[in-house]
Curated annotation (Swiss-Prot):
Component of the BTR double Holliday Junction dissolution complex, which is involved in homologous recombination during meiotic double strand break in the germline. Releases the supercoiling and torsional tension of DNA introduced during the DNA replication and transcription by transiently cleaving and rejoining one strand of the DNA duplex. Introduces a single-strand break via transesterification at a target site in duplex DNA. It comes from the Eukaryota. Residues 614-639 have a biased composition (Gly residues). It is an enzyme of class 5 (isomerase). A zinc finger (GRF-type) spans 716-759. This is DNA topoisomerase 3. It comes from Caenorhabditis elegans. The keyword Isomerase applies. One of its GO terms (molecular function) is DNA topoisomerase type I (single strand cut, ATP-independent) activity. Its EC number is 5.6.2.1.
Length: 759
């Protein structure tokens, strides 16, 4: 009888696979690690009875490390970290699992990898293969592809085994090696320099604060600091607007100005006076049209994380940890997916049928079955996993706390997705007073549709009284409203994930990990309301590299790497090609950064000085570390961190220009004939320069009359422009006597345009 070893990524998955393939009769025994059991069973594999042992690892077993001669921070050359040899070794905490795999590999003929079907899962599978093959070179290696722990999915995977995707493994190895080299070099550079300059703050021994760098975490930090600075530098600007209020049928209706708002009070006063002269409002148009509120698209990882943050008040990391637990226990499908459209061949009706048992949403599930299962699909597919959806029914008392909250979210989202849009009727009333146009809208809900189950969104009636097209009325009140422009809000974790997804920083599977890392390193803090604020250390790091002329906190460099990794996965580029290219870019920046490193300490000193004067700022430390699975990135943060940020200190405006003339630096080859010469101009020349945040407009000054040597020919904005007429402000006030241009048509004309310009 053949003997096969199945190895899953987690013990819960191993347990589920064994239970399904044995119909619940598998035997359990202990492995070397108490957390990773061994399950034994007999079943058919490749058309013949096979004795199978099922065990597991706990995420990544191995990582890239430098040799011992590069481990001393004081003596090893930092720039050599870009070309020094590295090795792929089993980490100390995984030694017991390694021992189990070696022992089991010797006793089996076939190895089947049952890790998660994503990039990291493929790389973990390659680590399992390496350990097992070192023990038994004769092993025949296969890979099972599945997206859920169900009988159908596991049985299908066991009958359709494939080989590991070596291109995907190469992409992960490329990223891991780059993270080690880049993170180690910049972490040592900035930590040693800042420790030396700020001994009291950071200490000087091996347990002191590590100022770590990661090529994904730094752009993530950059998004937070950019928003913080945008808010701090925001200049509020006053504005004015016209409002028409009218009461009918006991409803007070506010008609909004079609111009929205203007930033010049005098202009608004003039337009207000013109409207007052008319003394009546004319209903130009009353239109009714169907209005729909679309049900949500099928659920992918990014949307699950964002919903977990905004609706469940959980962090992205917590949401994904719970989702993975639910997946391992067979409650939901694989939660790390970029797909938001269900494949045509997937029968969703049985999944809806299961949920009819619920005393919470069972009636809605029955309604979905009566109307027909009709998923709203997006356009994305990773060609590996379906959207996240429930696999089996459970009740609230069977899941506790966050487990239930995430399960409920997945179920409600799924039922909403496969149901019907909410339907209503919108009424739009267009009003004219003098030369100015206004509008009001109402909404009457006719069918709540998906909103009956999707409690995370609201859509309410907004009733309007009856208006008749062409009618006129005088019992209205014309007002001038005022306000000030508001700064954007601080980012939430959901906002940050959206930006990371938009600019290609990390993947859907790693966004939460990167955010947790900059929290742990205390580069950002989280306010009680969930808003993210940089610490002054985070601000100083970003400013320091900006002042050197390197946009390290911008997404370009890392996004470019993510593109390279995808090209490796697709077979369009080789691992070594991408590795050499990225090492060349970052090494060029490192050489210049090392030369200008004093700028970094100057940046931190400015914030320290400002903090001492102002007594700190609104931020606070974060908490929680990232899970072992996924990318590294240059070391971990220390247990404590500097205070939160003050307002950014005053410093010369603008950034020093990037220097295109710099010493040529070589890549990491030992053979000088094969070295690629890379200059800083080449590093940044291939990507668009990041645009600085737009400076807010200064408040506009009141317009003044123009002195003209000859009469200006001015035309209005009618479809067929006519020469504008000149009028004079008659109202008492600072603008009395000023001339302005307006449309030549009479105020009573419906064709008169809204043109206005000071003369």
């Amino acid at each position: 009888m053949k003997r096969a070893l199945f190895v899953a990524e987690k013990n819960d998955v191993a347990k589920g696979v064994a239970a399904i393939l044995s119909n619940g009769t598998a035997n359990r025994r202990e492995g070397r690690s108490k957390f990773n059991k061994i399950y034994t069973l007999n079943t058919e594999l490749f058309g013949q009875q096979t004795a199978i042992s099922v065990t597991s690892v706990s995420g990544h077993m191995m990582n890239f490390q430098f040799h011992e001669n590069m481990s001393n921070w004081q003596t090893a050359s930092m720039v050599e970290l870009f070309r020094a040899p590295v090795r792929h070794v089993v980490t100390p905490e995984m030694k017991l699992i390694e021992q189990t795999l070696r022992e089991q590999a010797q006793r089996h003929d076939i190895l089947v990898v049952w890790t998660d079907c994503d990039r990291e899962g493929e790389a973990i599978g390659a680590e399992i293969v390496k350990v097992c093959r070192d023990s038994n070179r004769r092993l025949d290696i296969f890979r099972a592809r599945f997206s859920e722990i169900t009988k159908a999915a596991i049985t299908r995977a066991a009958r359709n085994l494939i080989r590991l995707d070596e291109k995907t493994v190469a992409a992960v190895d490329c990223r891991s090696e780059l993270d080690l080299r880049i993170g180690s070099a910049f972490t040592r550079l900035q930590t040693l320099h800042l420790r030396n300059r700020f001994r009291d703050l950071l200490g000087q021994n091996d347990t002191s604060q590590v100022i770590s760098y990661g090529s994904c975490q730094f752009p993530t930090l950059g998004f937070v600091t950019d928003r913080y600075k945008m808010i701090e530098n925001f200049v509020s600007e006053p504005f004015w607007k016209l409002i028409v209020e009218h009461t009918r049928e006991s409803h007070k209706v506010e008609f909004l100005w079609d111009r929205n708002r203007l930033f010049d009070r005098d202009t608004v006063d003039i337009l207000h006076d013109e409207c007052k002269e008319t003394k009546e409002a004319h209903v130009e148009k009353v239109a009714k049209k169907p209005k729909s509120k679309w049900r949500p698209q099928a659920l992918d990882t990014v949307e699950l994380e964002k919903l977990g943050i905004s609706k469940l008040r959980m962090s992205a990391k917590q949401t994904m940890q719970v989702a993975e637990k639910l997946y391992s226990k067979g409650f939901i499908s694989y939660p790390r997916t970029e797909t938001n459209k269900f494949p045509a061949g997937l029968n969703l009706t049985p999944l809806v049928q299961q949920q009819t048992q619920s005393n919470i949403w069972g009636d809605f599930a029955n309604e979905v079955l009566q109307n027909g299962v009709n998923p709203r699909n997006g356009r994305k597919s990773d060609e590996a996993h379906p959207p996240i959806h429930p696999l089996k029914f459970t009740e609230k008392h069977q899941l506790q706390g966050d487990d239930w909250k995430v399960y409920e979210l997945v179920v409600r989202h799924f039922l909403a997705c496969v149901s019907q849009d909410a339907q209503g009727e919108e009424t739009m009333v267009n009003l004219t007073v003098g030369t100015e146009k206004f509008h009001a809208s109402g909404l009457r809900i006719r069918d709540m549709g998906y909103l009956k189950v999707y409690v995370y969104e609201k859509w309410g009636n907004r009733l309007l009284p009856t208006y008749t097209e062409g009618e006129r009325f005088t019992d209205f009140e014309l007002k001038i409203g005022d306000g000030k422009t508001q700064a954007p809000d601080f980012l939430t974790e959901a906002d940050l994930i959206s930006l990371m997804d938009k600019y290609g920083i990390g993947t859907d599977a790693t966004h939460a990990e990167h955010i947790e890392k900059i929290k742990t390193r205390e580069y950002i803090g989280v306010r009680p309301d969930g808003k993210l604020i940089p610490s002054f250390l985070g601000l100083a790091l970003v400013d320091g590299y900006d002042d050197m002329g390197f946009a390290m906190s911008k997404p370009d460099l890392r996004a470019n790497l993510e593109i390279g990794l995808k090209e490796i996965c697709d077979g369009r580029r080789q691992k070594q090609e991408v590795l050499d290219e990225q090492i060349g870019k970052y090494r060029a920046i490192f050489v210049e950064s090392e030369r200008k490193i004093g700028v970094l300490s100057q940046s931190l000193q400015r914030y320290l000085d400002k903090n001492n004067q102002a007594g700190g700022g609104p931020g606070g430390p974060g908490g929680g570390g990232g899970p072992p699975r996924g990318p590294g990135g240059g070391g971990g943060g220390g247990p404590t961190g500097p205070p939160a940020p003050p307002k950014p200190p005053a410093k010369p405006r603008g950034r020093p220009p990037r220097k295109s003339i710099s010493p040529a630096v070589k890549n990491g080859h030992d053979d000088p004939e094969n070295d690629t010469i890379v200059t800083l101009s080449e590093v940044f020349g291939s990507m668009s320069n990041p645009k600085p945040a737009r400076k807010p407009r200064a408040p506009r000054k009141s317009a003044a009359p123009k002195e003209q040597e000859e009469e200006e020919e001015v035309f209005c904005q009618c479809p067929e422009p006519m020469r504008a007429v000149t009028k004079v402000v008659q109202k008492e006030g600072p603008n009395k006597g000023k001339k302005f241009y307006t449309c030549s048509l009479p105020y009573t004309s419906s064709e008169k345009c809204n043109f206005f310009k000071w003369a």
